A protein has these predicted regions:
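Core segments of cupin and vicinal oxygen chelate
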Residues: 11-64, 110, 130, 154
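Exposed loop/turn and edge beta-strand positions of beta-sandwich/beta-sheet ligand-binding modules
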Residues: 4, 50-51, 90, 133
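Residue-level detector of short, conserved catalytic/binding motifs and their immediate flanks
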Residues: 6, 55, 92
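Short, charged/polar surface micro-motifs in flexible loops or helix N-caps
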Residues: 62-64, 75, 101
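Glycan-recognition patch characteristic of GH18 chitinases/ENGases
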Residues: 83-84
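Vicinal oxygen chelate
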Residues: 1, 9-10, 33, 67-68, ...
């Protein structure tokens, strides 16, 4: 038996602003948006009674590849003054298969994201042994999560 990792939930400062970023940059859609009170047991953040809001966004599937945005409403969760400028141990790297890597980067830039790497052409040998020509770029979202965005341009036989 193999389990599916269906969602990654991110702590965000402003749920609406974060959701709009994912909707505009990657074309994701809101799947769920609900307030809830923490039990103080299962989640290793906050404490019992904290009022939060969970927004879940989906791309092409409603079982895998979803992103949750968790905002503390009361009390507000303290956020760092400065967002990361490099990836540290323990921080996730989100890898996106995009139909338009250049467009995603420009949309992210327009919404205020910090850009790490402008679109560049590169090649990789896939698990099937075929060489794939790619366009890749990378940037941070508005809460400091890092995204590597890749677009397959051509698969060689």
């Amino acid at each position: 038996m193999t389990d599916d990792i269906k969602r990654t939930t991110l702590l965000v400062r402003d749920g609406d602003r974060a959701a709009e970023w994912y909707e505009q940059v990657f074309g994701m859609a809101r799947w769920m948006d609900t307030p809830f009170t923490l039990s103080g047991e299962q989640l290793a953040a906050g404490k019992k009674g904290d009022q939060t809001r969970l927004i879940i966004l989906k791309a092409n599937h409603d079982l895998i590849g979803m992103i949750g945005l968790l905002e503390w409403l009361d009390p507000k969760m303290e956020a760092p003054d400065e967002l990361p400028t490099e990836i540290k141990f323990g921080a996730p790297i989100f890898v996106v298969a995009s139909q338009d890597a250049r467009g995603a980067l420009e949309r992210a830039r327009g919404l205020g994201s910090r850009i790490h790497c402008e679109p560049r052409e590169w090649s990789v040998t896939g698990a099937d042994g075929k060489v794939k020509d790619m366009i890749g770029c990378s940037f941070w979202d508005l809460d400091g999560y890092f995204f590597e965005v890749n677009q397959t341009v051509k698969v060689h036989d």
